[in-house]
Amino acid sequence: MTKRLFTSESVTEGHPDKICDQISDAVLDAIYEKDPQARVACETAVTTGMVMVMGEITTNCYVDIPKVVRNTIREIGYDRAKYGFDCDTCAVMTSIDEQSSDIAMGVDKALEAKVGEMSEEQVQAIGAGDQGMMFGFACDETPELMPMPIILAHKLTMKLSEVRKNGKVKYLRPDGKSQVTVEYDGDKPVRVDTVVISTQHGADVSHDTIEKDIMEHVIIPVIPRELLDEGTKYFINPTGRFVVGGPQGDSGLTGRKIIVDTYGGYARHGGGAFSGKDPTKVDRSAAYAARYVAKNIVASGIARKCEVQLAYAIGVAKPVSVLVDTFGTAVIPEEKISELVNKHFDLRPAAIINKLNLRRPIYRKTAAYGHFGRDDAEFSWEKTDVADALRKEAGL
């Protein structure tokens, strides 16, 4: 078989772009706690000593956005000036408008309802909030039905955060990144070739200490021993120093880590970010639905690998296209799989929202360490509750 290497990265919750994603989703959650019918498109930018929150929000409730921002930054861990960013002293500016009435008229009532093809009662008759294409993916490389490189990368950054917050490695700071290169034999992952960890740290710790502690407390507990060998390469803070980090080191923006959020580059991406968007925005809800479809297909045993593309027109409820690609791993014809998808999954925006129960304040948790491959109860798109029906109808 042909051997090849594939690499994915993850970032910690203290990475500047991820700070922005979490603030945007924390604002969405705060609004959804009071008004689950709100329309929210919230963007955030951070830089040294400053946060800017902007966007289009239509709601009947009041949310103290600066308070939400400061609480989010505090929970991430930037609560002291010596970390380069302080939740209590940073400036917070807001610029919020209502959703455009031109967009709202298409979301409020789908084209199908306007021309009599769908009644108001049919799945609330709302249209897609924008045009675009979204991808969902699943494969049998890991128990999470995700590609191995991104799962390992996320587990490393989650462990980095854990040992920082529980005090096991006291000198760690919130900003950090991981990168994992996996060697494949054909399409099977067989070993980890390279691990890269870069973590912000206090100024008074030696590089040797950091290398030792990260190996002992982060890498060894996370990467399965059978995937490591004498040829595995480790790069821990390879620049030699990472004291200046977070918004002091780099500015951050919502939506700049879309590959980290999804499949680590292993599957295609439609380009739309998730955080700060309510589920009438198909960038988010349809990407979740596409993952739900793909994961149930793989969980059913119909295919070992599956990618689903959905595409929408603004103001129109039904997808303009649905494509299922199993990369030659399916045990039944793909035409049959497409029939099963059309039968078992309603992919109109309001149907997705209802099926996955998306009008809930569940989004802050999604904004770090990946939107997919998680077993948290709130991640309804990770359920495999359609797999049995698909398996039965496929005759497996």
Swiss-Prot record:
GO BP annotation list: one-carbon metabolic process; S-adenosylmethionine biosynthetic process
Binding positions (Mg(2+)): D17
Sequence positions that bind K(+): E43
Keyword Protein transport assigned: no
Subcellular location: Cytoplasm
Family annotation (InterPro entries): ADOMET_SYNTHASE_CS, S-AdoMet_synt_C, S-AdoMet_synt_central, S-AdoMet_synt_N, S-AdoMet_synthetase, S-AdoMet_synthetase_sfam
Catalytic activity: L-methionine + ATP + H2O = S-adenosyl-L-methionine + phosphate + diphosphate
Record function comment: Catalyzes the formation of S-adenosylmethionine (AdoMet) from methionine and ATP. The overall synthetic reaction is composed of two sequential steps, AdoMet formation and the subsequent tripolyphosphate hydrolysis which occurs prior to release of AdoMet from the enzyme.
PANTHER family: S-ADENOSYLMETHIONINE SYNTHETASE
Stated name of the protein: S-adenosylmethionine synthase
Organism of derivation: Ruminiclostridium cellulolyticum (strain ATCC 35319 / DSM 5812 / JCM 6584 / H10) (Clostridium cellulolyticum)
